[in-house]
Amino acid sequence: MREYKLVVLGSGGVGKSALTVQFVQGIFVEKYDPTIEDSYRKQVEVDAQQCMLEILDTAGTEQFTAMRDLYMKNGQGFALVYSITAQSTFNDLQDLREQILRVKDTDDVPMILVGNKCDLEDERVVGKEQGQNLARQWSNCAFLESSAKSKINVNEIFYDLVRQINRKTPVPGKARKKSSCQLL
């Protein structure tokens, strides 16, 4: 079974842990408890393929930024999360993306831009178009709006990253099955 190392990044309070826990355990975490680092594992089926996802839920606070290079070096796919209710969290993502590209030393990194808390439409300050435009600027990066509370697009975030990783590095063994050996 193929393993995938996914990393959830973004400012403090955007809902990184809420999205991760909702995906892994099906629970909405109501209380905000700043994360230092949590790792979760979940087996899922994506496109008829069994996958083991290792999801690293990272700290959003500035005091743990030294650990980020290590997450970025080891991660295969990245969810960059902002809150649609806080413009500053959206603005912070440009630097995070640049750091990922610098650490990975390539522009071709599986990544998805996530506007979280879309259930709080009354409090929205970051328009959906802003997210779509930024994703386009980022070499047509994938983009979704989500809500951990309302279970909107939660699974899709992680499945999309798996699909991007599969496109970038096809599943070992699949290519071999296509070729055949003929003995005469």
Curated annotation (Swiss-Prot):
It is an enzyme of class 3 (hydrolase). Its EC number is 3.6.5.2. InterPro entries: P-loop_NTPase, Rap1, Small_GTP-bd, Small_GTPase, Small_GTPase_Ras-type. GO terms for cellular component: cell-cell junction; cytosol; glutamatergic synapse; lipid droplet; plasma membrane. Activated by guanine nucleotide-exchange factor (GEF) EPAC2 in a cAMP-dependent manner. One of its GO terms (biological process) is negative regulation of calcium ion-dependent exocytosis. It is found in: Cell membrane; Cytoplasm, Cytosol; Cell junction. One of its GO terms (molecular function) is GTPase activity. It catalyses: GTP + H2O = GDP + phosphate + H(+). Belongs to the small GTPase superfamily. Ras family. Heterodimer with RAP1GAP. Interacts with EPAC2. Interacts with SGSM1. Interacts with SGSM2. Interacts with SGSM3. Interacts with KRIT1. Interacts with RAP1GDS1. This is Ras-related protein Rap-1b. It comes from Rattus norvegicus. The lineage of its organism: Eukaryota, Metazoa, Chordata, Craniata, Vertebrata.
